[in-house]
Design a protein with these regions (language model features):
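N-terminal subdomain of nucleotide-sugar transferases
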Residues: 1-49
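Conserved donor-binding/catalytic core segment of Leloir-type glycosyltransferases
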Residues: 8, 165, 213-229, 235-238, ...
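Membrane-proximal helix-turn-helix segments that form the acceptor-binding/catalytic region
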Residues: 27, 84-91, 107, 114-118, ...
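Carbohydrate-associated surface elements
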Residues: 170, 192
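A short helix/loop element that forms part of the nucleotide-sugar donor recognition site in Leloir-type
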Residues: 199-212
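Nucleotide-activated donor-binding/catalytic signature segment of Leloir-type glycosyltransferases, i.e.
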Residues: 260-285
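Acidic donor-binding loop of glycosyltransferase active sites
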Residues: 288-304, 317
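Conserved acidic donor-binding segment of nucleotide-sugar-dependent glycosyltransferases
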Residues: 335-344, 352-358
């Protein structure tokens, strides 16, 4: 019997916490396991365990409970603990590949590669955005010396891996052009869906249970409720939509909810906006399948892919979004694109989708067909498998 290839996944985040990058990592793990890979996940102390995944956590840090995306000063010492945990797993398990997710994961993976394996084990970097660009969206880089420091840290990280798996075309371009990585070391592996994930019927009465009229047009947003993820673009667009059609309702899934709830209350739009807080990822289809239109209000600055768009497509929804390279890569002609990253254009396109339900439905059907043909994880993961095979064969020589 052929030996399973062991992959040590270093995940510098509270996995699993029902948010975008976690959904990508979960999708990858599930798809890789179908190709016979044994995945070990080394991650933070918080987050929840999932059946069927080998998740190993650092020691408990009782005062650190943050689950949402975004930087934190606590991560500096937590990532030191992550290194020691990853090193101990490496010594015990002798993995064939180290797969560092996000920049910190690649950095910790690089330390394990060079300090523990002495360069013997290949390191792959799962790139989900630019570190400096993303920190900029969280207003962490207002002081120039700090920006310079993080840019050079990102540059250093990009010298450590043997291969780069990028979550978007933009990420791939950043890695090749800004950090001068050879093109043959870079593959773009767009987020996928497991095509059976949405094979269920909408729950009867679920819309009413959420306080939404059964006949009301429903626009859904899922994801982190953070400025960097575009939530304020959506919230500020809602009054523009309601000024022209008061029958439209909005369903917002995600967390943290406090700032968004406060802003919705200030705008006086609470009667038409329904917030759920954190939702179990495995219940996500129930919410998408009662919706008519999905919205992605993020402006692409950090090169991040948008896993939510893939889920919207998998549920057969028309998608309103800004006109960016990443959104075009996902949706092609199936997107309802708002020009110039302007909030009023986003509002206009949401109204158009409500007022033209037949055309919007056709776009949703196009999206579902496209995701099944192009973005299923079974198809997307083949490039990752090819890279892993190349690296393990090279290591065996």
């Amino acid at each position: 019997m052929e030996r399973q290839i062991k992959v040590l996944n270093i995940v510098p985040t509270p996995f699993f916490a029902d948010r975008g990058c976690h959904m990508r990592i979960l999708g990858e793990m599930q798809a890789l396991s179908k190709y016979g890979y044994q995945n070990i996940i080394c991650t933070y102390h918080n987050g929840r365990d999932l059946e069927g995944l080998d998740i190993r956590r650092i020691i408990n840090i009782p005062w650190y409970k943050k689950l949402e995306a975004g930087p934190s000063w606590h991560k500096f010492y937590i990532d030191i603990l992550l290194f020691f945990k990853a090193a101990s797993i490496y010594i015990k398990e002798k993995p064939d590949i180290i797969y560092g997710h996000l920049h910190e994961g690649a950095f910790v993976g690089g330390l394990v590669k060079y300090l523990v394996s002495f360069g013997r084990v290949p390191l792959v970097f799962d790139v989900q955005g630019s570190l400096t660009s993303e920190l900029g969206t969280f207003n962490w880089l207002k002081i120039k010396p700090i920006k310079w420091l993080f840019h050079n840290f990102e540059k250093f990280i990009c010298k450590m891996p043997d291969f780069f798996i990028c979550s978007s075309v933009s990420n791939g371009e950043i890695i090749k052009n800004r950090f001068h990585v050879k093109p043959e070391k870079v593959k773009v592996v767009i987020d996928g869906v497991h095509t059976d994930f949405f094979n269920r019927l909408p729950k009867m009465g679920f819309k009413s249970k959420l306080g939404i009229p059964e006949d009301a047009p429903l626009i859904i947003f899922t994801g982190a409720l953070l400025a960097a993820k575009g939530i304020w673009n959506l919230v500020d667009a809602i009054p523009m939509v309601l000024s022209k059609n008061k029958n439209i309702h909005f369903l917002i899934l995600g967390y943290p909810v406090e700032e968004t709830e406060k802003r919705i209350k200030e705008l006086g739009i609470g009667a038409n906006v329904h917030m759920t807080g954190m939702v179990d990822y495995f219940d996500l289809p129930d919410y998408l399948l009662i919706s008519d239109i999905a919205v992605e209000p993020k402006v692409d600055k950090a090169g991040e892919a948008s896993g939510k768009v893939i889920n919207y497509m998998g549920a057969g929804l028309p998608v309103v979004c800004f006109d960016s390279q990443n959104n075009r890569r996902f949706l092609e002609d199936g997107g309802i694109y708002a020009a110039e990253n302007k909030i009023e254009n986003l509002a206009d396109k949401m109204l158009w989708a409500v007022e033209n339900p037949n055309q919007a439905k056709i776009l949703g059907e196009m999206n579902k067909k496209r995701v099944e043909e192009v973005f299923s994880w079974n198809k997307s993961i083949k490039d990752t498998v090819e890279a892993f095979q190349m690296l393990t064969q090279k290591k065996a020589r």
